[in-house]
Structure formats: C-alpha cells, structure tokens
A protein has these predicted regions:
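Phosphate- and divalent-cation-binding pockets in alpha/beta enzyme and binding domains
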Residues: 1, 28-29, 144, 204
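A glycine-rich helix N-cap at a beta->alpha junction
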Residues: 36-49, 218
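Short internal beta-strands
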Residues: 16-24, 156, 194-195
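Conserved phosphate-binding/catalytic loops in two-lobed NTP-binding clefts
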Residues: 217-227
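Catalytic metal-binding/acid-base residues of hydrolase active sites
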Residues: 25, 140, 160, 199, ...
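Active-site-proximal loop->helix
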Residues: 29-35
C-alpha cells in the first residue's frame, strides 16, 4: 500500500516533494498511515479535492479529477499530455525571425524582432493530439467516466467481477463487471482497456477475457507490474 510506496521512494533517495491528490480527508488518512514511515527524506504535499470536477494544471500536462459512483467518495482521473503544433518555418522566414529565436517561440515565449512583437501563435500550427490516460476504480458505470475516458490512449478500469451472475452484487457494492467496463471502453472509443481491481474471489481473471473481447477487442486482463509505452501519433 501507500506506506510501502513511500518507504521505497525514501530508500531510493528521493528528495523532491511528492504531491498526493485525493478526496477531502486525504491528509488525515495518509498521516495516520505514516506511523510505519515517520521519517522520509522528502516533503509530502496534499491536494484535497472538493469539487465534483476539478482540473489540476502542471507544466506540459493536466489531470482532470471527476467524482464517480461508489459507497464512499471516490474519484476517477484522466491525465492529458499536451502537445504543441508544428513550428511553421515558412511563416518564421516570412516574418524575418532570426533562427536563434525560433526555440523561444517553440517554448511558448513571446519575442521582439526589430521593434515588432512576435507571439507563438504567429508561427505555430494548431495543437496536435497529445496522450491521454484515464484511470477509474471503485464505481458503477457513469456518464462522466465515459465522457472523461473519451479517446484515451489507455483506459485503466476496474473489472471486479467476470461472472454474469455477479451483476446484482456489482450493483449492490457499487462496482463494475468486466463486461460493463468493456462497454464503457467501446462507447468512449479508447485505444486499449486494461482491467484491474479484481474481486479476491476472482482467482483467474484471464478466464473471462475472450468473452469480454467480444464487446471490446483491445482488452487486457492486467496484473501488477504491467507496463507499456505510449507514443505520439506523429
């Protein structure tokens, strides 16, 4: 769990501050868990979410947090890596912009050339498609999950139950079946779905994957430690 992760980071000699984002009350819970990790070589900072929908902007990417439907307050998260448009050399030459100034415009900086202000939008094309990863566990299917997961390169979603007969239990416990997660992935037009957060009684989640792929073919029954590399389209 979280204490083990914090200890691992400390043992890896991490010194930069760690930002932890979660529902209201997060700091109290984490501080209580830290009884086994009281001394860490880095600061923990907290961002407690209070709105139903909240965007957290970082340098080059942002995270959209959105409430989901569970027995306690839970959020899903969609991380989007933004990507600027292509630098248009012909426009830069037309404006007589010195080559040594091009990198400043590519970084989003405004420059001045011969007394004239040059802004990035004068030489940059339209923003290109970036990368998007959406993560959601502990919820019944909701419209907000589908909306925030739309066009994700990777959608990581709970598949608590694989057996159709557990549909009633999923509704009662406010969880999803694998089939429901696959249906969201299909409607959201994601590239790939990783199922996770299985019921302890679900010993072999792979047993259900062929049936789930009839709904959404690009489905994986993920396990701890699974990794992938996402790449820009161009």
């Amino acid at each position: 769990g979280l204490p083990g992760m914090l200890l691992t980071m400390g043992n890896a000699e991490r010194t930069e501050p760690l930002l932890v984002i979660g529902p209201k009350g997060l700091q109290r819970v984490v501080n209580a868990l830290r009884v086994i990790a009281p001394e860490l070589p880095f600061e923990i900072r907290f961002l407690e979410l209070e709105e139903a929908k909240q965007r957290i902007q970082f340098d080059g990417f942002y995270i959209d947090a959105f409430k989901v439907n569970h027995n306690v307050v839970c959020y899903g998260y969609s991380m989007v890596v933004e990507r600027a448009g292509k630098f248009q050399v012909d426009k830069a030459l037309e404006l007589n912009i010195p080559k040594q100034c091009w990198s400043h415009l590519q970084k989003g900086e405004t420059i001045e050339v011969e007394g004239k202000e040059i802004t990035p939008n004068m030489v940059m094309g339209d923003p290109r498609k970036g990368l998007k990863v959406t993560y959601c566990t502990d919820s019944r299917p909701t419209d907000s999950i589908r909306e925030y997961a739309a066009e994700s390169d990777l959608f990581i979603c709970e598949g608590m139950y694989g057996e159709p007969e557990n549909q009633a239990k999923a509704k009662d416990k406010k969880h999803m079946t694998m089939q429901e997660a696959a249906q969201i992935a299909k409607m959201a037009n994601v590239k790939e779905l990783w199922l996770t957060h299985y019921s302890p009684s679900l010993i072999r989640p792979d047993e259900y994957i062929n049936e789930v792929r009839k709904i959404f073919p690009a489905t994986v029954a993920a396990r701890d430690g699974r990794m992938t590399e996402l790449k820009f389209m161009d």
